[in-house]
Each structure stands twice: as structure tokens, then as C-alpha cells.
Curated annotation (Swiss-Prot):
PROSITE patterns in the record: RIBOSOMAL_S12 (PS00055)
Pfam families, per the entry: Ribosom_S12_S23
GO BP annotations, alphabetical order: translation
Name used for this protein in its record: Small ribosomal subunit protein uS12
Organism (species): Prochlorococcus marinus (strain MIT 9211)
Entry's Gene Ontology molecular function annotations: rRNA binding; structural constituent of ribosome; tRNA binding
CDD domains the UniProt entry points to: Ribosomal_S12
GO cellular component, one term: small ribosomal subunit
Length: 123
């Protein structure tokens, strides 16, 4: 506990919050170009081949982003839209690619949670 005299001398420091997605620079989404599309293996208890892409953003950052859903059409030089949101079992992956925008196609034959995967209404 500081004394009143200490508080007069120097005021209390404000706590600064560290952002969880610095590459977005306070924007909800960011556009970028894929520099590499590959698969990655998750952390210890899980086992899979998760689809990820290295993306160079318009803000100048180069980040790793997760490609959600089953199957994708992304390749090098594809223009994608990124949102925040980490993948818990992939270290260093703090962003998600938004399906159904720009060069990213929506998930085919998706019936539930369609809006999250850019899928149109099934006939």
C-alpha cells in the first residue's frame, strides 16, 4: 500500500492490456495473400493433420491461419480474409480464415452451422 505522499509524487500506473491478435491492428478482419498452404500436427493428446496457411497481411504482418471445415481450395497466392480466434491445439495459430469470401470457397454439402462456413442453402 502506498502512502498518500507517494501517490502525490507518482500516480498509479494504468494496467495495459495485451491484444490476443496483434496482426489485425484493432480491425475485425484483415485481407491477406497465402504464401504457403500446408498441414500441421496438433499438440500432445490430439492427433490429426490440421490444414493451415501462412498469410501475408495488408498490415505487413506474416501470420499462420487455420483453414476451418472439410476440404478447401486454397493455394499459394490465394487472397483470403482473416478473423481473430486461436486454435487451442496448434501453437502459434491465432487466426482463422473466413470461408466463402474472396478466393476461399465455402464448405460443400454443409447443412448445419452454414453461416460459419460460407455454405449456401441446400436445395
Amino acid at each position: 500500500m502506498p502512502t498518500i505522499q507517494q501517490l502525490i509524487r507518482t500516480e498509479r500506473k494504468r494496467l495495459t492490456r495485451k491484444t490476443k491478435s496483434p496482426a489485425l491492428r484493432s480491425c475485425p478482419e484483415r485481407r491477406g495473400v497465402c504464401t504457403r498452404v500446408y498441414t500441421s500436427t496438433p499438440k500432445k493428446p490430439n492427433s490429426a493433420l490440421r490444414k493451415v496457411a501462412r498469410v501475408r497481411l495488408t498490415s505487413g504482418f506474416e501470420v499462420t491461419a487455420y483453414i476451418p471445415g472439410i476440404g478447401h481450395n486454397l493455394q499459394e497466392h490465394s487472397v483470403v480474409l482473416l478473423r481473430g480466434g486461436r486454435v487451442k491445439d496448434l501453437p502459434g495459430v491465432r487466426y482463422h480464415i473466413i470461408r466463402g469470401t474472396l478466393d476461399t470457397a465455402g464448405v460443400k454439402d454443409r447443412r448445419q452451422s452454414r453461416s460459419k462456413y460460407g455454405a449456401k442453402v441446400p436445395k
